[in-house]
């Protein structure tokens, strides 16, 4: 199913296969640079530039989510800015199909503090499109403020993370 995704906002998976008790994906080679390198000297981003990056990623996620899959590891390191300036979401190695009830068939926890929502910290946490959207919102926060978001559980205990508007007004 991953090989059937065709959208400019997500890397194209050409082939998926298993060998030696391991799963492999062959993907398009993308030229450009990682988002965090591309953003050096550009932070914080204004609304126009933020939307130029985020909209194609949201369009790509709509394709992924429409087939019942989740990326599960959206973070700045997995977003590339191509030579033409367009963004592409990479690294579908953690992607999994999720059941309609939000249960995940994966046994592995995938987390990047600040970008992973609370449900990814629990083996049986219910995941859905909201899981990827939380992570993308964390990337947006970082692009607007220049600060990585707080870890989800730290925010659940005591949310001291300043809003993007508060940081922008300093």
Protein language model regions, located:
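Flexible N-lobe loop architecture of eukaryotic-like protein kinase catalytic domains
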Residues: 6-9
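C-terminal lobe helix-coil module of Hanks-type protein kinase domains
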Residues: 114-170
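Activation segment signature within eukaryotic-like protein kinase domains
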Residues: 53-54
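Conserved short submotifs of the Hanks-type protein kinase catalytic core
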Residues: 20-34, 38
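Activation-segment/catalytic-loop signature of the eukaryotic protein kinase fold
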Residues: 16
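Activation-loop N-terminal segment of eukaryotic-like protein kinases
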Residues: 81-85
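Protein kinase catalytic-loop region centered on the HRD/HxD motif
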Residues: 58-69
